[in-house]
Regions:
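A ligand-binding cleft/hinge motif common to bilobed small-molecule-binding domains
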Residues: 50-53, 65-75, 120-123, 137, ...
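Periplasmic-binding protein-like
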Residues: 7, 84-92, 155-202
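Extracytoplasmic small-molecule ligand-binding "clamshell" domains
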Residues: 1-66, 75, 132
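A conserved helix-loop-strand patch within extracytoplasmic ligand-binding domains
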Residues: 39, 43, 47, 68-69, ...
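Extended ligand-binding regions for polar small-molecule ligands
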Residues: 27-36, 95-98, 102-103, 107-108, ...
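Ligand-binding clefts/hinges and TM-proximal coupling segments of bilobed small-molecule sensing domains
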Residues: 116-133, 169-175, 201-218
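Short, well-ordered beta-strand segments
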Residues: 2-5, 91, 108-111, 151, ...
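Short, Asp-centered acidic motifs that coordinate Mg2+ and/or phosphate
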Residues: 1-2, 57, 61-62, 149-150, ...
Length: 218
């Protein structure tokens, strides 16, 4: 099986050693699923927004990339049981004057292209301008360079950046619920495979493997 994943979105996807080794919660979870499927899995890393055409055009068999189940995505693809609840989080630089959701009024917000976060920003009706970035590194750079006033990203990713660079960033407000959880995405004709994956996810939860993997990252 060829598994499509995101180029870089810690703690879900992390490249290390000159991009030769890939790890992270999504990767470890998928490798365990592959082991239980008795399948050989190869990971292909894409810019997040390119994962959708890659799956549609069958360059990959499955996608795991902190992929949120949304109504829009369900029109085109099928999803496994969610393996984690999905939340978003606003983040800004430590010296920013933005401290609350109200302070976000009329501000420029950076989001990763292909995520449901642009829609979430605009639905808050704060007259925001959304700036799209292909890579999370570029989005954080845009934040540092004042191209944007704040960014909206996966809650776990925001917590990761806060922990790794506490003197650079701060969180704005609490996490916000979005979608129906993080899930493994497939083309509709792969429903038999998704059923097998669902069974494995439940087994992993029951035998403690899921909690062990989760505890390594969160």
């Amino acid at each position: 099986l060829t598994i499509g994943t995101s180029k870089f979105n810690p703690p879900f996807e992390v490249w290390s050693g000159n991009n030769s080794s890939l790890h992270g919660f999504d990767i470890d979870l998928m490798q365990e699923i592959c082991r239980r499927l008795h399948a050989t899995c190869a990971f292909e890393a894409y810019i997040f927004d390119d994962l959708f055409p890659a799956l549609k055009n069958r360059k990959v068999d499955l996608v795991i990339a902190s992929m949120i189940i949304t109504d829009e995505r369900k029109k085109l693809f099928i999803f496994s049981l969610p393996y984690m609840e999905s939340n978003s989080q606003y983040i800004t630089t430590i010296h920013s004057k933005i401290n609350t959701f109200d302070d976000l009024q009329d501000k420029k917000i950076g989001v990763r292209k292909g995520t449901p976060y642009a829609r979430q920003v605009l639905s808050a009706n704060r007259n925001n301008q959304v700036i799209f970035y292909e890579l999370i590194q570029d989005m954080l750079l845009g934040l540092s360079n004042n191209e944007v006033d704040a960014s909206l990203m996966d809650y776990e990713a925001a917590k990761y950046w806060m922990a790794s660079e506490p003197y650079a960033y701060k969180l704005i407000g609490n996490k916000i619920s979005i979608g129906e959880g993080y899930s493994i995405m497939a083309n509709p004709d792969q429903y038999v495979l998704i059923k097998k994956i669902n069974k494995i996810l439940l087994e992993m939860e029951a035998d403690g493997t899921y909690l062990r993997l989760y505890s390594e990252y969160f």
